[in-house]
Amino acid sequence: LDYELTVLTVSSSAGIVTCAPIGQRQESGDYRESWQPATFTPDVLEQAQHIARTAVEGLVAKAQASGEKGWGVFGVELFVLTDGNVLFNEVSPRPHDTGMVTMASQRLSEFALHARAILGLPITQEHVALSIPEGTVAASHAIVVQGDGEAEFRNVAAALAEPGTDLRVFAKPEVHGHRRMAVALAVGGNEADARAKAGNVAESLDIAIV
């Protein structure tokens, strides 16, 4: 295994389209970072898009056979091997955690795409286009809080002082043990820059359990 990709695939009244592949880093099987567009060869892109489209076409056909529409966002996870071959891992019939980066990278986030699709609005390649300047990369960094109680976010202004950064705090009132409570977003000149900026936002926050 060389690396993993997520291809967000959208089924709507206009058919099936795919977003630019998303790179990701996991810890113990849980998402920690993602970035879009990921770096890959043209052959990997072709394989990834073909596998994602084929998987979703099959699921949509099954849904339609039972009288459903099969519309929405599907997160297709893929393994890229060191020899360049791409293998299917799994598919989530919903917006995907690694796809939170689309809140910074695309014209429409995965959440907006999902809402529009299930409402019957057509989704075309135009709607899934990247909105960041050409040559730049967007990144997300999960903020996982440990403790028992309510999480209070402090030092937010300082954490977001660097241009091209953002923070989305989830509407989760309490944490018991460990829980993903927010996500840091950033746009940078390349993958390393974007990931570092998002990571700096996460590390600069002072999160207290009250």
Features from the language model and the residues they span:
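Internal nucleotide-binding/catalytic subdomain
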Residues: L1-D83
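Broad gene-expression machinery/nucleic-acid interaction feature
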Residues: E4-T6, T18, V73-G75, F88, ...
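Short, acidic Gly/Pro/Ser/Thr-rich loop/turn segments
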Residues: A14-V17, Q26-S28, H96, D148-G149, ...
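Conserved residues at beta->alpha junctions
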Residues: I22, T82, S105, L185-G188
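Short, flexible active-site loops
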Residues: G29-T39, E90-M103
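Active-site "cap" helix and flanking loop/linker of ATP-utilizing ligase/carboxylase catalytic domains
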Residues: Q47-V76, T82, S92-G149
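A short, glycine/Asx- and small/polar-enriched loop/turn
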Residues: L81-L87, H178-R180
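Peripheral (often C-terminal) accessory segments that flank ATP-dependent C-N-forming ligase machineries
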Residues: R116-V210
